[in-house]
Structure formats: structure tokens, C-alpha cells
């Protein structure tokens, strides 16, 4: 009876020994899991496991995030070109035609442009076809007279009294040619609300209703076809007449001479401050008015 007992004990010891060995009870057998760390750090990676990159672990059922796309450059909105046109600076007269007045004041800032259509400010005397114009360009209809840039001719050499000009004499206004070299076609209009205070042999005078009561004088319209009479009340933009070449008994070139007068502060010969009602350079007021016209502005 001892042999069976002995064999049974041997089998039990054999099984327990294997369990102890493979289970690592005594530190000698293989381990199926990493031992717990003893220094508080993370457990070492088991062979075959991916090395962590320090980021959050992606779970299998989570959607794969879309890679960020390059930012799309949104084009900047178009900036409109400033509304202007080609013109010489104020006071820049044709060479040898006189000394221009270099004033930068817009004396009539809300003035209505005095033509219904496009027009060209330049010199009718020193330009082609004028009495002092270039000999090689004898025609007043020369294309250069009807193209940009504009040119100032206030204070151009003349014998007329004009206190702001050198020696107190010079051209009293600005010459403006109509859209084409044709007379009695293109309408001239009122520069502001006012009254027609005088009609002369070849002049029409408009006095503004509002202070400072500027005075505008128009020359060389077709005087037999005027749209207004002396004493008429007009609004800015109202038709006055058509550009022509009336100049008494001697016709001039086809153009409209435009003057601006108003009271300005001055000093008398004995040093006293006075108000002087005199001719003022209209060029920059015309430039500003033409800019508004080209931009679609209406006379008010």
C-alpha cells in the first residue's frame, strides 16, 4: 500500500513545482506580465508593444482626425482708384505766358461745374490757334486743345486789372473749351444758386444767393441764344447759354471765359485790415467740381 501513496505524493509535488516555476512564485520562471515598478515611474514596455509618443492614445473606434489644411488666402477687396483726372498744378502756366498765382485755396468748394458735358481748361491765347500760340499749330481745333491735362491760366499776361497777379495785372479768370471744337452746341450752366445780376455785350453775371455771395462772370456765350434774362433766379446746374466765340465786334476762339469774385481779407496802404472784393483764381474750384461731376455727383 505504500507505493501507491508514494506515487500520488510524487505527482502532487511535480504539479506544484511546475506551477511555482512557471508562475514565478520564486523568481526563477518566466513571467507573463511586467513586475510592478518600484520607483514610482511608468512600467517598462513589453516586447512588441508600440512605444508611446507622449500623446493621448487613439482608441480603435474613434474617427481618424482630418489633417489640418493650409489656410486659404482671402484676396483683399479691390480699392477703387481715386476719382481724378490729369491736370497741371495751380499756377503752372505755359512757359513765357506770365507768372501764375500759386494759391492752393478752393475758393468755391461746392461749386457746380459750369459745363453740362466734359470740358478742357487751358489757354485760348497761348494755345494752338491763339494770338500768341505756337506757329506750327495754327488751328484752334488742334487735338491738344481738346485733351488732358488741364492747365491754369489765371494771371496769364494781360493788361486787365487783377490785384492778386504780379504788378496788379493779368488774366482775370480761366479759359475753358467745350467738349468739341464747335460753337453754339454745348450748354453752360449756373455755378450755384443765385440771380442773374447783369447781362453785357458778351458777358453774363451770376451772383450767389448765399454768403459770401460769390460773383461768377461768364464770357463768350452766344448772346442771342441765352436761356436766361437779367433778374432771373437760377439754381445750380440751370442752363444759361451755349459756349461760342462772341467778343463784341471781334470774335475770339470757341471757349468760355469763367471768372470768380468774392470778398477777401486784405490790408490797406496805411496798414488797416479791409475786405477786398476782387478776382480770385477759379482753377482749383473747377478741378474739384469736375472731380465731383466725373464721380456722378449732381449740382446742389
Please report, for each region that a protein language model flagged, where it lies by residue.
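N-terminal Sec-pathway targeting helices
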Residues: 1-11
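Zn2+-dependent peptidoglycan hydrolase active-site motif and core
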Residues: 161, 183-230, 249-259
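Surface-exposed, glycine-biased beta-strand/turn segments
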Residues: 75-203, 236, 292-300
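Conserved, short, structured surface segments that act as functional micro-motifs
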Residues: 176, 232-300
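Short amphipathic beta-strand/extended segments with alternating polar/hydrophobic composition
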Residues: 137-157, 216-221, 267-292
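Residue-level detector of conserved, well-ordered beta-strand and adjacent loop positions
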Residues: 52, 177, 207, 219, ...
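Ser/Thr-rich, Pro/Gly/Ala-heavy low-complexity intrinsically disordered linkers and tails
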Residues: 28-74
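Hydrophobic single-pass membrane-insertion segments
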Residues: 17-33
Amino acid at each position: 500500500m505504500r507505493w501507491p501513496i508514494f506515487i500520488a505524493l510524487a505527482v502532487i509535488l511535480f504539479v506544484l513545482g511546475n506551477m511555482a516555476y512557471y508562475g514565478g512564485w520564486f523568481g526563477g520562471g518566466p513571467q507573463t506580465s511586467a513586475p510592478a515598478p518600484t520607483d514610482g515611474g511608468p512600467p517598462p514596455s513589453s516586447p512588441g508593444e508600440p512605444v508611446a509618443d507622449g500623446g493621448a492614445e487613439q482608441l480603435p473606434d474613434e474617427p481618424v482626425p482630418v489633417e489640418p489644411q493650409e489656410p486659404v488666402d482671402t484676396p483683399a477687396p479691390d480699392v477703387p482708384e481715386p476719382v481724378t483726372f490729369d491736370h497741371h498744378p495751380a499756377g503752372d502756366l505755359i512757359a513765357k505766358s506770365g507768372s501764375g498765382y500759386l494759391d492752393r485755396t478752393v475758393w468755391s468748394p461746392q461749386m457746380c461745374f459750369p459745363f453740362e458735358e466734359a470740358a478742357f481748361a487751358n489757354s485760348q491765347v497761348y494755345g494752338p490757334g491763339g494770338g500768341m500760340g505756337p506757329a506750327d499749330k495754327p488751328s484752334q481745333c488742334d487735338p491738344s486743345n481738346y485733351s488732358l491735362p488741364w492747365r491754369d491760366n489765371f494771371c496769364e499776361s494781360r493788361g486787365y486789372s487783377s490785384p492778386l497777379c504780379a504788378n496788379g495785372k493779368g488774366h482775370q479768370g480761366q479759359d475753358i473749351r467745350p467738349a468739341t471744337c464747335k460753337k453754339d452746341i454745348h450748354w453752360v450752366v449756373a455755378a450755384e444758386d443765385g440771380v442773374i445780376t447783369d447781362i453785357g455785350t458778351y458777358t453774363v453775371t451770376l451772383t450767389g444767393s448765399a454768403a459770401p455771395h460769390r460773383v461768377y462772370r461768364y464770357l463768350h456765350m452766344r448772346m442771342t441764344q441765352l436761356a436766361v434774362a437779367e433778374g432771373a433766379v437760377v439754381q445750380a446746374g440751370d442752363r444759361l447759354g451755349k459756349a461760342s466765340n462772341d467778343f463784341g465786334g471781334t470774335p475770339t476762339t470757341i471757349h468760355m471765359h469763367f471768372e470768380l469774385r468774392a470778398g477777401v481779407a486784405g490790408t490797406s496802404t496805411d496798414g488797416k485790415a479791409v475786405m477786398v472784393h476782387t478776382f480770385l483764381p477759379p482753377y482749383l474750384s473747377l478741378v474739384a467740381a469736375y472731380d465731383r461731376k466725373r464721380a456722378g455727383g449732381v449740382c446742389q
